Each structure stands twice: as C-alpha cells, then as structure tokens.
C-alpha cells in the first residue's frame, strides 16, 4: 500500500508544479528551495519536507533542476494522463464546469453530463455535450471508463449521487454541493460560500 500523504501536502504539490511552470516560462534552469519558498510564501524546510515524501530531488548547495522537478511532480500528479469526467447536475454550476475550456487543456475531459429534470434532457450543456438522464449514470460510467465524478446537485441529493458514482467505479469525486459526503474514494469539496466566508472574516479582521 502506498504511503499515506497528508492532504495539505498534495495541495502544496500543485502549487509547486504551477510555480515551476512559471519558472520554465521565465527561462530559469535551477531554483533553490529558498526561492520557491519566497515565491509561494512558505518555509524552505516545508518544501524540502514535502518533496521528501516522493524521493530525493536536487543537491544541497545547488538547488533543483527546474525542468526535472517539474516533470517529476507532474508524474506524481498524473498530468500526462487524460482523465475522463462526468458531471451530475446540469444547473448553473454543472454547465459552467462543462464549459470550462481550461480543464480540457489540462487533461480533464468531460465525457457526460446528467440531470433528473426532464426539461433538460437532450439539451446542449456545452459544445458537443448534451444532458442525459441520471438514470443512465452507472451504465455510462462503466462503459466509458470514467474516473472522476463532479457533483453539482442540491445538498439533499449529493450523498446518494456520490454513492452511485462510487458503486459504478468512479475513482474520485469533485463535490460542489454545500454538504460533506461520505464515500471511500477521495473527495475534494469546493464550497464557494465557505471560501467567501473565510474571505469576509479576513476583511473584517483587517479593518477592525
């Protein structure tokens, strides 16, 4: 069994990858953990500790080869693979996700979108993507080898949809519903309102 990596590490790993991408664009060939830390507002020791979960990178006193580290982290994150996704919920969020072109550019291909509203069936949610009946969800996931499910349904239906996705063989879930779901596969919760509350807390705190 693979070593369990703390979730904050995986989130920072994405930040490292994006920072290294910018460094490559700038033509930087070697970078120190101190410079990465400065750019990301972290401690250099934290970066070194995070990377140590995955092996040895760089040389003491020299730094990291930017291209090598970028490729290595990309391999860890699975960026070279094209991931198949389905969206459940063809409301505003579901359609917005389906139309987000950057996802396809980054290796995330939405292959289906589902809803329970008969008035939405057969309508185009995004270019080349029409809404299907949610009753067909499991069959579609199994037949197309879908790996990631995106939940964009009301809170009261999120747990049921998550369980159906898991049973169908989904490997991970991106959850936009404002409720925590409990399944055995990895879940990433995106709660826009909660994030805004954190932001307003910081604003109020700064201005008091």
UniProtKB/Swiss-Prot annotation:
**Gene Ontology molecular function: any one:** DNA binding
Give the UniProt keywords, A-Z: Cytoplasm, DNA-binding, NAD, Repressor, Transcription, Transcription regulation
GO CC term (a single one): cytoplasm
Note the InterPro entries from the entry: CoA-bd, NAD(P)-bd_dom_sf, Rex_DNA-bd_C_dom, Tscrpt_rep_Rex, WH-like_DNA-bd_sf, WH_DNA-bd_sf
Q: Which Pfam families does the record cross-reference, listed alphabetically? A: CoA_binding (PF02629), Put_DNA-bind_N (PF06971)
Gene Ontology BP term (one) = response to redox state
Record-annotated DNA-binding residue ranges: 15-54
Q: Which family does the entry's similarity section mention?
A: Belongs to the transcriptional regulatory Rex family.
Q: HAMAP family of this UniProt entry?
A: Rex
- What's the name of the protein? Redox-sensing transcriptional repressor Rex
**What organism is the protein native to?**
Thermotoga petrophila (strain ATCC BAA-488 / DSM 13995 / JCM 10881 / RKU-1)
